[in-house]
UniProtKB/Swiss-Prot annotation:
Homotetramer. This is L-rhamnose isomerase. Pathway: Carbohydrate degradation; L-rhamnose degradation; glycerone phosphate from L-rhamnose: step 1/3. The keyword Repeat does not apply. GO terms for cellular component: cytoplasm. Belongs to the rhamnose isomerase family. Binds 1 Mn(2+) ion per subunit. The lineage of its organism: Bacteria, Pseudomonadati, Pseudomonadota, Gammaproteobacteria, Enterobacterales. Its cofactor is Mn(2+). Pfam families: RhaA (PF06134). Mn(2+) binds at H262, D294, D296.
Length: 418
């Protein structure tokens, strides 16, 4: 470490030790908590299936910042820079539309070989991979229904797509030695008030059971399902509601995905974690930033991001909660978006690990809510930034906003040529 950072580090460790926090133990734990970065920030959820395709499914990437990745080589290059600017363990989350093939491949015919380059790249960079079927931006999803579609042939197409995706996910886990979390999200819903809310959910229930019917090694693959309140064009009814997927995950013992932007604006997923963990074996978190709706803004180090991290740490949910990010902002440098959001998630985890939780819990058990509030607020002023800077330097990444210099240089030399 540089002298000034080392001095600040030593003083900060003393401050935390005074309130019973072991900084070294906290950093050891932090190094076991990977954050899964989402590949789709790099190209505005376009994928490689149809570069001129239109994004559908009630989601939007707004903006037109130059330098968008146009193929797998460019996307991996951009990711490599972002990964080099973020300390600690990371994973990469892929969608099915990021396959690589010299010929057109129907989505229900995708195979592990179409993702072999991603696996080789992940091995090189010591990354785990996660996966998602892509049930949007496709002619057979154009009317707003996929796994709950009333047409059995269309429904079967999407069932087969999800089944193929599970095999790819298991391939990731087997090849990389760490389980791939495969999350199923579908856009199915209606713009206006439906007459029959039940039948689409019955079809979805049956379709999901068929999707997960093939037994896969849990050391290689984990199933997750994700709810949503509404989307553009599906404002009045969403088939895969919170209640539907909570019941499904609990009854089938799959993982449940909680997306920070998929609930009413007055709801927060940090308050849902402890309840859900009583009924489901695992949680997948999509940490995002909804601004008045599921806008998928870049994650900030704000109250909710911190609350999410604190819930994981306070309740020792390290082995049951998988942390992923889900945002896509096309109005700013896309590499910077990855770096900002992922570093903020890691900062939140570090701050949670540096909290004197045992002390605060004892105050709560004694009913001393005055001291609990006082100390909870005072600990926010403890010098966690000095520990963060030391952690960055230990991991050979820029300590502060100097990472932006590397992004600007890359933008000038590489992105500006696209």
């Amino acid at each position: 470490m540089t002298n000034s950072i080392e001095q600040a580090w030593d003083l900060a460790k003393q401050r935390f030790a005074a309130v019973g926090v072991d900084v070294d133990a906290a950093l050891t734990r932090l190094d076991t908590l990977p954050v899964s970065m989402h590949c789709w920030q790099g190209d505005d959820v376009t994928g490689f299936e149809d570069p001129d395709g239109v994004l559908t499914g009630g989601i939007q990437a707004t903006g037109n910042y130059p330098g968008k990745a146009r193929n797998a080589t460019e996307l991996r290059s951009d990711l490599e820079l972002a990964l080099a600017l973020i300390p600690g363990p990371k994973r990469l989350n892929l969608h099915a539309i990021y396959l690589e093939s010299d010929t057109s491949v129907a989505r229900n015919k995708i195979e592990p070989r179409h993702f072999s380059h991603w696996v080789a790249w992940a091995k090189k960079h010591q990354l785990g991979l996660d996966f998602n079927p892509s049930c949007f931006s496709h002619p057979l999803s154009a009317d707003g229904f996929t796994l709950s579609h009333a047409d059995p042939e269309i429904r079967q197409f999407w069932i087969e797509h999800c089944q193929a995706s599970r095999r790819i996910s298991a391939y990731f886990g087997e090849q990389l030695g760490t389980p791939s979390v495969m999350n199923i999200w579908i856009p199915d819903g209606m713009k206006d008030t439906p007459i029959d809310r039940l039948a689409p959910r019955q079809r979805l229930l049956s379709a999901l059971d068929e999707v997960i019917s093939e037994k896969l090694n849990p050391a290689h693959h984990i199933d997750a399902v994700e709810s949503k309140l509404f989307g553009i064009g599906a404002e009045s009814y969403t088939v895969g509601s919170n209640e539907f997927y909570m019941g499904y995950a609990a009854s089938r013992q799959t993982a449940l995905c909680l997306d920070a932007g998929h609930f009413h604006p007055t709801e927060v997923i940090s308050d849902k974690i402890s309840s859900a963990m009583l009924y489901v074996p695992r949680l997948l978190l999509h940490v995002s930033r909804p601004v008045r709706w599921d806008s998928d803004h870049v994650v900030l180090l704000d109250d909710e991001t911190q609350a999410i991290a604190s819930e994981i740490i306070r309740h020792n949910l390290f082995d049951r909660v998988h942390i992923g990010l889900d945002f896509f902002d096309a109005s700013i440098n896309r590499i910077a978006a990855w770096v900002i959001g992922t570093r903020n998630m890691k900062k939140a985890l570090l701050r949670a690990l540096l909290e004197p939780t045992d002390m605060l819990r004892q105050l709560e058990l004694r009913g001393d809510y005055t001291a609990r509030l006082a100390l909870l607020e005072e600990q926010k002023s403890l010098p966690w930034q000095a520990i963060w800077e030391g952690y960055c330097q230990r991991n050979d990444v820029p300590v502060d906003a100097r990472w932006l210099d590397a992004v600007r240089e890359y933008e000038q030399q590489i992105l500006s040529q696209r």
